[in-house]
């Protein structure tokens, strides 16, 4: 059983309480340790990510779920930028979140299912 790190707790501030609950339950049952690397996002940060082509939302006319506190980004502990997006740890981690979301009766959308944003989890 894993517990939320200081970094995860900090990054969950301002995030919808349902996502906080989701993270807590997922950590308790996950076979893969993970960290929440981003939650609530400022307009300035969103604009920066858009300019860097790291987001499709410009932060002004197209608001990100992160700006509403309705999305988180998670990485498994030990993740490296050189790891394959097909790494089995992603599948295990996302499966844990899907299972937990179902148990909590949450409607979630996963960047993993889009095929290009593995860390992203948002409330529908």
Regions found by a protein language model. Name each.
Residues 1-35:
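Active-site acidic/histidine clusters and adjacent loop/turn architecture
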